[in-house]
Amino acid sequence: MKIALIPGTFDPFTIGHLELVKIASSLFDKVVVCILVNPNKTHLFDEDARLSMIRRSVEAFSNVSVDIDHGYTADYAKKIGAEYIVRGIRNEIDAKYEMEMADFNLKRTGVRTLLIPAPEEIAGISSTRVREELKQGNSVEALVPEEIKSVL
Protein backbone atom coordinates (compact mmCIF):
# COMPACT_ATOMS: atom_id res chain seq x y z
CA MET A 1 0.00 0.00 0.00
CA LYS A 2 1.38 3.39 -1.00
CA ILE A 3 0.91 5.93 1.78
CA ALA A 4 1.45 9.68 1.51
CA LEU A 5 1.54 12.40 4.14
CA ILE A 6 0.34 15.95 3.58
CA PRO A 7 1.64 17.93 6.57
CA GLY A 8 0.89 21.51 7.53
CA THR A 9 -0.54 23.87 10.10
CA PHE A 10 -3.67 24.47 7.98
CA ASP A 11 -4.65 27.65 9.82
CA PRO A 12 -7.09 27.56 8.06
CA PHE A 13 -7.44 24.88 5.37
CA THR A 14 -7.68 26.47 1.89
CA ILE A 15 -8.73 25.44 -1.62
CA GLY A 16 -5.01 25.13 -2.35
CA HIS A 17 -4.72 22.48 0.35
CA LEU A 18 -7.83 20.75 -0.99
CA GLU A 19 -6.34 20.67 -4.50
CA LEU A 20 -3.26 18.97 -3.08
CA VAL A 21 -5.47 16.39 -1.36
CA LYS A 22 -7.35 15.73 -4.63
CA ILE A 23 -4.13 15.09 -6.51
CA ALA A 24 -2.53 12.99 -3.77
CA SER A 25 -5.66 10.88 -3.30
CA SER A 26 -5.54 9.91 -6.97
CA LEU A 27 -1.85 8.94 -6.77
CA PHE A 28 -1.71 7.05 -3.47
CA ASP A 29 -3.68 4.27 -1.79
CA LYS A 30 -3.86 6.19 1.49
CA VAL A 31 -3.31 9.87 2.25
CA VAL A 32 -2.95 11.29 5.75
CA VAL A 33 -3.45 15.02 6.19
CA CYS A 34 -1.67 15.85 9.43
CA ILE A 35 -1.90 19.07 11.39
CA LEU A 36 1.58 19.59 12.76
CA VAL A 37 1.41 21.70 15.88
CA ASN A 38 4.15 24.24 16.42
CA PRO A 39 3.96 25.51 20.02
CA ASN A 40 5.97 28.59 19.03
CA LYS A 41 3.28 29.79 16.60
CA THR A 42 0.12 31.67 17.43
CA HIS A 43 -2.88 30.24 15.62
CA LEU A 44 -6.16 31.84 14.62
CA PHE A 45 -7.96 28.49 14.92
CA ASP A 46 -7.28 25.94 17.65
CA GLU A 47 -6.37 22.32 16.89
CA ASP A 48 -9.92 21.00 17.23
CA ALA A 49 -11.34 23.67 14.90
CA ARG A 50 -8.69 22.94 12.26
CA LEU A 51 -9.24 19.20 12.59
CA SER A 52 -12.99 19.67 12.11
CA MET A 53 -12.52 21.99 9.10
CA ILE A 54 -10.21 19.56 7.35
CA ARG A 55 -12.38 16.53 8.06
CA ARG A 56 -15.39 18.32 6.58
CA SER A 57 -13.39 19.33 3.52
CA VAL A 58 -11.98 15.88 2.73
CA GLU A 59 -14.88 13.62 3.69
CA ALA A 60 -15.59 12.86 0.01
CA PHE A 61 -12.22 11.10 -0.29
CA SER A 62 -12.46 7.56 1.08
CA ASN A 63 -8.69 7.10 1.15
CA VAL A 64 -7.94 10.30 3.10
CA SER A 65 -7.70 10.58 6.89
CA VAL A 66 -6.85 13.49 9.16
CA ASP A 67 -4.62 13.51 12.23
CA ILE A 68 -2.74 15.83 14.60
CA ASP A 69 0.87 15.45 15.71
CA HIS A 70 3.23 17.49 17.86
CA GLY A 71 6.48 16.17 16.41
CA TYR A 72 8.55 16.54 13.28
CA THR A 73 7.18 15.89 9.79
CA ALA A 74 9.74 13.25 8.83
CA ASP A 75 9.32 11.38 12.11
CA TYR A 76 5.54 11.29 11.72
CA ALA A 77 5.88 10.14 8.09
CA LYS A 78 8.09 7.29 9.20
CA LYS A 79 5.69 6.41 12.05
CA ILE A 80 2.72 5.97 9.69
CA GLY A 81 4.75 4.18 7.03
CA ALA A 82 4.47 6.97 4.47
CA GLU A 83 6.65 6.60 1.40
CA TYR A 84 6.13 10.21 0.41
CA ILE A 85 5.59 13.60 1.95
CA VAL A 86 3.44 15.64 -0.44
CA ARG A 87 3.97 19.39 -0.56
CA GLY A 88 2.51 22.10 -2.75
CA ILE A 89 4.68 24.82 -4.22
CA ARG A 90 3.29 28.20 -5.26
CA ASN A 91 6.42 30.02 -6.34
CA GLU A 92 10.23 29.89 -6.52
CA ILE A 93 10.61 30.72 -2.83
CA ASP A 94 8.40 27.76 -1.87
CA ALA A 95 10.30 25.52 -4.30
CA LYS A 96 13.71 26.42 -2.86
CA TYR A 97 12.59 25.88 0.73
CA GLU A 98 10.75 22.65 -0.05
CA MET A 99 13.74 21.23 -1.94
CA GLU A 100 15.94 21.87 1.09
CA MET A 101 13.39 20.22 3.39
CA ALA A 102 12.96 17.29 0.99
CA ASP A 103 16.71 16.67 1.04
CA PHE A 104 16.79 16.91 4.85
CA ASN A 105 13.83 14.52 5.27
CA LEU A 106 15.26 12.00 2.81
CA LYS A 107 18.63 11.94 4.56
CA ARG A 108 17.05 11.77 8.02
CA THR A 109 14.41 9.10 7.44
CA GLY A 110 14.54 7.89 3.85
CA VAL A 111 11.09 9.36 3.15
CA ARG A 112 10.85 11.04 -0.25
CA THR A 113 9.00 14.26 -1.01
CA LEU A 114 6.68 14.83 -3.95
CA LEU A 115 6.43 18.51 -4.87
CA ILE A 116 3.28 19.50 -6.72
CA PRO A 117 3.10 22.95 -8.35
CA ALA A 118 -0.08 24.87 -7.62
CA PRO A 119 -2.27 25.66 -10.62
CA GLU A 120 -1.77 29.29 -11.60
CA GLU A 121 -5.32 30.28 -10.64
CA ILE A 122 -4.77 29.29 -7.00
CA ALA A 123 -1.04 29.95 -6.60
CA GLY A 124 -1.73 33.16 -4.68
CA ILE A 125 -3.87 31.48 -2.05
CA SER A 126 -2.38 30.75 1.36
CA SER A 127 -3.58 30.39 4.93
CA THR A 128 -1.78 33.65 5.69
CA ARG A 129 -3.81 35.44 3.02
CA VAL A 130 -7.05 33.97 4.40
CA ARG A 131 -6.19 35.13 7.93
CA GLU A 132 -5.34 38.63 6.65
CA GLU A 133 -8.61 38.86 4.72
CA LEU A 134 -10.57 37.71 7.78
CA LYS A 135 -8.84 40.29 10.00
CA GLN A 136 -9.81 43.01 7.51
CA GLY A 137 -13.40 41.81 7.48
CA ASN A 138 -13.25 40.69 3.84
CA SER A 139 -14.95 37.65 2.36
CA VAL A 140 -12.82 34.51 2.02
CA GLU A 141 -15.43 32.43 0.17
CA ALA A 142 -13.25 32.13 -2.95
CA LEU A 143 -10.26 30.98 -0.88
CA VAL A 144 -11.63 28.13 1.24
CA PRO A 145 -13.49 24.87 0.55
CA GLU A 146 -17.29 25.02 0.39
CA GLU A 147 -17.58 22.76 3.43
CA ILE A 148 -16.02 25.29 5.81
CA LYS A 149 -17.33 28.62 4.52
CA SER A 150 -20.02 28.72 7.20
CA VAL A 151 -17.42 28.25 9.95
CA LEU A 152 -15.41 31.26 8.85
Report the location of each language-model feature.
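Nucleotidyltransferase catalytic core that binds NTPs
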Residues: 1-152
